[in-house]
Amino acid sequence: MNSTEPDSDRVTRTDRLNAPEIADVQALARAAGDADGADPFDEHTLLRLRDPHAPTHHLTARTANGTLTGYAHLDITNPTSGTGVELAVHPAYRRRGTGRALARSVRAAVTGPLRAWAHGDHPSAAALAVDLDYRRARVLWQLRRPLTAPIPEPPLPDGVTLRAYRPGADDDAWLALNAKAFADHPEQGQWTAADLQARRDEPWFDAAGFLLAVDPAGQLLGFHWTKIHERPGSARIGEVYVLGVDPTAHGGGLGKALTAAGLAYLRDQRGLDRVMLYVDESNTAAVALYERLGFARWSAHVNYQLG
């Protein structure tokens, strides 16, 4: 463990957090999300926060009395291609130099390229990125749609049927299809059995809402994995969590049919009235598909790179 001393708070780096420290970070994330309208850490980061074996560095900023004022998460799974970074400062302790101190500590802790996410694309994050020579490299859109509006009912391709995912029995086939469908995706396509199991262990997991498209021989051709977000004080919202189609099945309308089937499940079986999804700005085909299905842009999440 080592530390640096910024102007206001003490920034400390460690490879593992204990239970009280994890609780502090989770509370900070909730406060920042409530204040900013966008959660500062994605699901991947929150899962690794609790995993003592994850290849991760943690940077915490605290006042002299030990109050957590800021946190930065460094994912060092593949430092050659770039260390992943997510950072947040507690709303009550902003404009004190904490964010800049954490960002500088991140640079001091890493020798290779950096890939930092700014969820919500806030002006302060953009200004800090410019000051520290990061370049805007990638944008994810969050799109939303009311489920009270009519949902299209496009037909499935001939011979294709839908069924629910079977935990354990479908794992290998789904992982293979996921890797194939997201071969060019920097995160999703690299999922392992451990990544799948980690999501299955989460309270939100619902096998009935994990829809698989199969051909007459039982081979997986596509999937729509739905998720429901529940947060105290907020209305529930569904998510098109992961949607994938085998490249050999592209062009037959399977993606549209899977999307519609998942939306109908969230509305009819789970009683939801709204849904969201994330899509890369550069994936113009997917953006066009979702817009035709009634989705509209809600917020942006920006990836900044250095080195």
Curated annotation (Swiss-Prot):
Q: Where does 1D-myo-inositol 2-(L-cysteinylamino)-2-deoxy-alpha-D-glucopyranoside bind?
A: E43, E187, K227, E239, Y278
NCBIfam families (UniProt xref)? mycothiol_MshD
Function field:
Catalyzes the transfer of acetyl from acetyl-CoA to desacetylmycothiol (Cys-GlcN-Ins) to form mycothiol.
Assembly and partners are described as:
Monomer.
Designated name of the protein: Mycothiol acetyltransferase
Residues reported in the UniProt entry to bind acetyl-CoA 1 = L87, A88, V89
Domain spans labelled N-acetyltransferase: 12-157, 160-307
Keyword annotations of the record: Acyltransferase, Repeat, Transferase
- Biological process according to GO: mycothiol biosynthetic process
Q: Name one GO molecular function term.
A: mycothiol synthase activity
EC number of this enzyme: 2.3.1.189
- Where, in this chain's numbering, is acetyl-CoA 2 bound? L243, G244, V245, H250, G251, G252, G253, L254, G255, K256
What family does the database annotate? Belongs to the acetyltransferase family. MshD subfamily.
List all membrane-crossing ranges.
Answer: none
Q: Which reaction does it catalyse?
A: 1D-myo-inositol 2-(L-cysteinylamino)-2-deoxy-alpha-D-glucopyranoside + acetyl-CoA = mycothiol + CoA + H(+)
* InterPro entries in alphabetical order: Acyl_CoA_acyltransferase, GNAT_dom, MshD_Acetyltransferase, Mycothiol_AcTrfase
Q: Name one Pfam family in it.
A: Acetyltransf_1
Asked if the Swiss-Prot or TrEMBL record annotates the protein with the keyword Acyltransferase, the reply is: yes
